[in-house]
Amino acid sequence: ANGSKADGLKTVYPSKTFPNHISIVTGNYPSNHGIISNYFYDPDTTKFGKRPFYIGAGSTAAQDGRWINAEPVWVTVEKQSKRAMIMFWPMSDAEIMGIRPSEYYVYNEESNNKERMDQILSWLDYNGNARPSFLASYFSSVDHNGHDHGPNATQTIEAIAEADQAIGHLIDGLEARNILDEVNIIIVSDHGMTETPSSKYINIAEYLNLDDVVIVGRGPFMEIRPKNDNVDEIYQSLIGIEHTQVFKKGETPKDFHYGDNNRIEPILLLADEHWSLVTPGYSSSFGSHGYDPNYRSMNGIFVAHGPVFKSGFSGPEIRNVHLYEMMCSIMNVIPANNDGSL
């Protein structure tokens, strides 16, 4: 009630975890920052080998800053003689452009939300020049429960309540230190979530010989690389599948801002909301995201509180690529080139 909120935080395409986390902190669309999905290949095998970029426990790719082609806000801050400290923001444990946050933790799923907030509070206890200008953290439990049980399931609602309690714990800690009115807090989510009932699936093997293609991704979308360069032929065989849209690279909707990066495969098959694209043996989850960002269900949230934010203000939907410029402005640092604006 005493902060600001937006009617929604519009995600970038694809509405997946890593592309959106990196868009939030760089102000760039995925085709410019390079993290085009949670799982993808780079054709430059001399630089990256033949292994894909992927996320999850033990991913070495997600700790390799060479995959990112844009400057995250913590690098901007550190370059301008301020300090950034981060508790589990995707790729904050990678060296990017030769720079790391002053302090950071490698992602550990076992760390609960309260522990994550306690670490943020302890960093705020630093004095003078040691004190950070930028802090960030990430709660993963809402996403996990949304996938496993569906966005409206009891378990997911409980996970949201737990995240809310952890934020309450942060607020209490700031109040106890008498700094609540000095700190600007921005609470966002990287994407939304929609129900994906097990009855709504499209088995792509009914339309393609899977031996002829490399398929990257399952669920809301698939990127497809024909092994024999017969893009037109494969594309034609995918036209008109019910509950899908198919695009050649570079022909995706303009507001996706998706298509120029060499990591994007030649064909994109995109499912309608609630539908899942599968191959034999792939089981879909009860909730998913990655669909067209124009579906309201893919929206994230934006809530903010602090000296720069109006009290009791409710504004229209904003795009997450604008947050980087906003954060730079708050901290009085000069932003790197980006796709957003204030």
Language-model regions: role of each:
Residues 1, 162-204:
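Metal-dependent active-site segment of extracytoplasmic phospho-/sulfohydrolases and closely related
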Residues 1-33:
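Short, structured active-site-proximal loop/turn typified by the sulfatase FGly-forming signature C/S-X-P-X-R
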Residues 2-6, 32, 79-85, 129-135, ...:
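Loop/turn elements at helix/coil->beta-strand transitions in domains of secreted/extracellular proteins
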Residues 6-9, 23-25, 73-76, 83-88, ...:
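Structural recognition of the beta-strand scaffold that forms the well-ordered cores
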Residues 6-13, 87-89, 255, 314, ...:
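Surface-exposed patches in mature extracellular/periplasmic domains of secreted proteins
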Residues 8-11, 58-64, 74, 106-108, ...:
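Second-shell loop/turn segments in exported
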Residues 28-150:
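His/Asp/Glu-rich, glycine-adjacent segments
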Residues 216-326:
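Active-site neighborhoods of enzymes that stabilize oxyanions during catalysis
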